């Protein structure tokens, strides 16, 4: 329904604009690229539309924003407790079910609470004394890059840009699943990049076939030392039976084990350093991380410019 409404309002706007549709689409790209604010986009759109066709611009913009907002997860409203004059048994059932529902529900927290204080000025500008809060909310930019917001793009963010790109090359619309797949692909790509950077800096263990890695940051063992505690098996010596409990006693040489383990520990702990641009450059030398040569070359060029 939302896709049909976007296409219907878009076709009506194309007919009303005529040759100015390309100019209108270019203005929308500037708004999506954060070059213009929403107010500037509305002002430029009013210049190429007559007053009797201005409502088509508002309908198209409203349908497009509703389409993008449809990808946002809806918050479940709290269930309304209905009162009834039933017996004590029904009241007990309601009380127990309400307690169980309260256990399942949780209060959503603001994502900005988990952002570092150094980055809060980028996301949420400081309030100005003497200016009402309503005017301050209007001064905030409605569209920002993901690098400025410090959050990964969601499906709605990607869907709006996909629609503009599809209309540019002559496509009618974009399927909703495409935006969700791209959002998941961005998360997987970022996970692979971070994993490659960390594995270049830290030791880690792999599974038998080498497909999975784990225990990242494990210290490298000294080959000249032999830890006899970890090499011994459970059944290497006869079991000692407890005569009182008649159960197997697996506590063997406890004091000696502590001594051996303390002797095999590291004398100096490993120093934790910050991930630098050099670490990113070394990790990106693996061409399997980024398959696209265009994306790889652009990011490597940006890394080199930031390092020099």
Swiss-Prot record:
The gene is Ada1-2. One of a pair of almost identical proteins differing at a single amino acid position expressed from genes (Ada1-1 and Ada1-2) resulting from a gene duplication. InterPro entries: Hfi1/Tada1 (IPR024738). Component of the Spt-Ada-Gcn5 acetyltransferase (SAGA) complex consisting of wda/Taf5L, Saf6, Taf9, Taf10b, Taf12, Ada1, Spt3, Spt7, Spt20, Sf3b3, Sf3b5, Nipped-A/Tra1, a histone acetyltransferase (HAT) module made up of Gcn5, Ada2b (Isoform B), Ada3 and Sgf29, and a deubiquitinase (DUB) module made up of not/nonstop, Sgf11 and e(y)2 tethered to SAGA by Atxn7. Not a component of the Ada2a-containing ATAC complex. GO terms for molecular function: transcription coactivator activity. This is Transcriptional adapter 1-2. Its main location: nucleus. Transmembrane segments: none annotated. It comes from the Eukaryota. One of its GO terms (cellular component) is nucleus.
């Amino acid at each position: 329904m939302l896709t049909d409404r976007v296409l219907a309002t878009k076709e009506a706007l194309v007919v009303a604009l005529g040759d100015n549709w390309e100019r209108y689409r270019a203005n929308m790209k500037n708004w999506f690229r954060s070059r213009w604010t929403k107010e500037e986009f509305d002002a430029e759109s009013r210049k190429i539309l007559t007053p009797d066709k201005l409502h088509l611009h508002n309908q198209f913009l409203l349908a497009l924003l509703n389409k993008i907002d449809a990808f946002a997860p809806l918050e479940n409203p709290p269930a309304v407790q209905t009162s009834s004059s039933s017996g004590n048994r029904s009241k007990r059932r309601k009380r127990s079910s309400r307690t169980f529902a309260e256990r399942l529900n949780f209060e959503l927290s603001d994502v900005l609470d988990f952002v570092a204080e150094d980055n809060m000025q980028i996301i949420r500008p400081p309030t100005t004394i003497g200016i009402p809060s309503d005017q301050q909310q209007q001064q905030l930019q409605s569209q920002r890059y993901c690098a400025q917001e410090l959050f990964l793009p969601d499906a709605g963010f990607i869907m709006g840009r996909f629609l503009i790109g599809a209309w540019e090359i002559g496509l009618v619309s974009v399927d909703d699943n495409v935006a969700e797949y791209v959002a998941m692909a961005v998360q997987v790509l970022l996970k692979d990049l971070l994993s490659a950077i960390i594995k270049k800096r830290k030791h880690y263990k792999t599974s038998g076939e080498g497909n999975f890695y784990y225990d990242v940051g494990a210290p490298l063992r000294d080959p000249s030392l032999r830890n006899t505690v970890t090499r011994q098996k459970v059944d290497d010596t006869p079991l000692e039976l407890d005569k009182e409990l008649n159960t197997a006693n697996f506590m063997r040489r406890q004091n000696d084990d502590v001594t051996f383990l303390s002797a095999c520990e590291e004398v100096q702990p490993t120093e934790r350093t910050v991930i630098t641009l050099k670490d990113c450059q070394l990790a990106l030398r693996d061409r399997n991380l980024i398959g696209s040569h265009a994306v790889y070359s652009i990011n490597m060029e940006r890394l080199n410019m930031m390092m020099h």
